[in-house]
């Protein structure tokens, strides 16, 4: 565990709360200035020297506040470059996993691409972006590498899995924020002479919402612990799939509890739920991770699965 996590989360919580609702051109410069991009870079290389649990804590806060700025992508990019011994260029560095779009690609000064055991760093002038938007209205651009890589190195990191973990971490915060909004609404909204929260059907729905949010929290924590241990492919596959299930169940509940107000652009809920629905598909959707997890489980067999689960849990918690 990082000794500076309390300081880190206090700083992130205050900054992200101040930036909630602010556009990219306001939010990103402040996020960059705070130095979050070097969260995983060792201290002797000029970074924070944090671990994946630190990353989880920060990404969770970003999701909680619906931060309109890339955070996971530059953190992962700087970590990969530091591990490869490649100097990171100035500005926003995003990532390109195989077959995936590039978050905030049009604003990036460089893109880190990992495929076939090779990491490549491309400057923006070697990239062509086909601009598009995510369901939350954020840049989600297709990239073509039309120029030569500025640097490259061998790399066996599963970039798609790291991106998937990042989305689970952010979703854990967004689900908490959506749950809080829903709780506040049903406690204050009066219908038929009493608060909505007094109705049994509402209570049951909110209990289910709470269960889904807790499941994503636990999945994200397991991923971070496994990443710090060094082997997280199983946990990430399970967590990304579980996140998809949670979004499928929790988002409709959040909107049912609010009624029409939840869909208005001025209200905070849709800024959370649109992100959640987009993150469900980014860095591999439900079908992709279900297949990857299923193949892994089938290969282990019944008794083998139990032994594997027990061993992984012992390594992470022990």
Model-derived regions, located:
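FAD-binding core of flavoproteins
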Residues: 66-75, 79-180, 184, 307-318
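Alpha-helical interface subdomain recognition
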Residues: 1-65, 165-318
């Amino acid at each position: 565990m990082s000794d500076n996590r309390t300081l880190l989360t206090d700083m992130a919580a205050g900054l992200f709360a101040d930036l909630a609702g602010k556009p990219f051109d306001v939010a990103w410069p402040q996020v960059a200035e705070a130095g979050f991009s070097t969260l995983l870079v060792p201290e002797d290389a000029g970074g924070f020297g944090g671990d994946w649990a630190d990353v989880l804590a920060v990404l969770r806060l970003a999701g909680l506040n619906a931060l309109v700025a890339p955070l996971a992508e530059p953190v992962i990019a700087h970590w990969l470059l530091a591990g490869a011994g490649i100097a990171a260029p100035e500005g926003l560095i995003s990532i390109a996993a195989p077959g995936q779009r590039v978050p905030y690609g049009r604003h990036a000064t460089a893109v880190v691409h990992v495929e076939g055991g090779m990491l490549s760093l491309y400057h923006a002038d070697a990239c062509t972006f086909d601009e598009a938007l995510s369901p939350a209205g954020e840049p989600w651009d297709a990239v073509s590498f039309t120029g030569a890589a500025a640097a490259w190195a061998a790399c066996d990191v599963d970039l798609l899995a790291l991106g998937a973990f990042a989305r689970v971490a952010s979703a854990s915060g967004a689900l908490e924020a959506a749950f809080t909004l829903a709780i506040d609404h049903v406690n204050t909204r009066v219908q038929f002479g009493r608060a909505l929260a007094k109705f049994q059907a509402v209570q049951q729905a909110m209990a289910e919402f709470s269960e889904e949010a807790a499941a994503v929290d636990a999945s994200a924590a397991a991923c971070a612990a496994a990443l710090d241990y060094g082997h997280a492919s199983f946990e990430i596959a399970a967590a990304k799939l579980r996140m998809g299930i949670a979004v499928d169940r929790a988002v409709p509940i959040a909107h049912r509890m609010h009624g029409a107000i939840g869909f208005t652009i001025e209200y905070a809920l849709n800024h959370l739920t649109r992100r959640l629905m987009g993150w469900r598909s980014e860095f591999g959707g439900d079908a992709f991770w279900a297949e990857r997890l299923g193949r892994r489980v089938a290969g282990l067999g019944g008794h083998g699965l139990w032994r594997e689960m027990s061993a992984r849990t012992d390594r992470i918690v022990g």
